[in-house]
């Protein structure tokens, strides 16, 4: 069992139950899944970019990535329906906690001038989106062997009813949010 999952089961659940005044342990918010998406714009002109993106995303996630294809044709982008345009992977269970652990303790501290992740990434339903500009912050990716620096989007889906519950959960798990601006502290 990963350290993060063990900490969630033994410490975080109990503190959330007390702090949120929940009546049942089933109402405690938890992380349901993590979706990692990598869009590859160069895939329109060269198919090898998608193959390298799939390989690198599979190394980062520890699970085989799936190629995503265009739903519609867009002439201005020289895009045809069904063309590969990126890849994604959905993590659940043990692999999800392992990835989250590596993200929090290894990858995010390697970001240049890191001051925390933005607080505005919540969608209103208790889910959090985080964009990463360089996939090379993960230790699985060698900067010398990659053909181009790619960005990726990480979506953390929780069972929380609202953004405040989700923010509390993710802060307790250990996601390093930026300090709240002075105007938000009074709210």
From Swiss-Prot:
Record has Glycosyltransferase as a keyword: no
InterPro entries in the record: Ribosomal_uL5, Ribosomal_uL5_bac-type, Ribosomal_uL5_C, Ribosomal_uL5_CS, Ribosomal_uL5_dom_sf, Ribosomal_uL5_N
GO CC terms: ribonucleoprotein complex; ribosome
Signal peptide: none
Pfam family of the protein (one): Ribosomal_L5
Claim: rRNA-binding is one of the keywords in the record: yes
SUPFAM superfamilies per UniProt: RL5-like
Organism superkingdom: Bacteria
Keyword list, A-Z: Ribonucleoprotein, Ribosomal protein, RNA-binding, rRNA-binding, tRNA-binding
One MF annotation (Gene Ontology) recorded for this entry: structural constituent of ribosome
A Gene Ontology biological process term: translation
Biological role stated in the UniProt entry: This is one of the proteins that bind and probably mediate the attachment of the 5S RNA into the large ribosomal subunit, where it forms part of the central protuberance. In the 70S ribosome it contacts protein S13 of the 30S subunit (bridge B1b), connecting the 2 subunits; this bridge is implicated in subunit movement. Contacts the P site tRNA; the 5S rRNA and some of its associated proteins might help stabilize positioning of ribosome-bound tRNAs.
Xref: HAMAP family: Ribosomal_uL5_B (MF_01333_B)
Assembly information from the UniProt record: Part of the 50S ribosomal subunit; part of the 5S rRNA/L5/L18/L25 subcomplex. Contacts the 5S rRNA and the P site tRNA. Forms a bridge to the 30S subunit in the 70S ribosome.
The family this protein is said to belong to: Belongs to the universal ribosomal protein uL5 family.
Descriptive protein name: Large ribosomal subunit protein uL5
Organism encoding this protein: Brachyspira hyodysenteriae (strain ATCC 49526 / WA1)
Gene (name only): rplE
